[in-house]
């Protein structure tokens, strides 16, 4: 997408780093797979520095800490026209991945786990599919960002494009 201008190295770095937030959101779904295959915990390493930021913000601001981090990302980066379109697009895409994971987490906690139990085959399979899908989407997007390309994830990318102004 050359019509948006060339993508500088610093934009590639920041475009890659924002996906650490999506990896942090995927940590919740990693329990079953990481317990069975500890090697998968390697894929969670980029999310741990974000866990420190979230923990600090929650301790400082209470239950509004994670909302504050969301607002900083959305208003400070996505809606800031002085930041390159590439970084804003990737930030919006990681916010959408995080929202999707949060919605899945709510559905799991309030509907599926009470109905099927906490450790059945169905629940474990859902956790593993959501975890692997979110990790695959995050790492795919990180690799595309390093290469200076826009990561195209069906539906999520379309929503990100509609939210990011030119």
Model-derived features: where do they sit?
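Alpha-helical membrane insertion/targeting regions
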Residues: 1-166
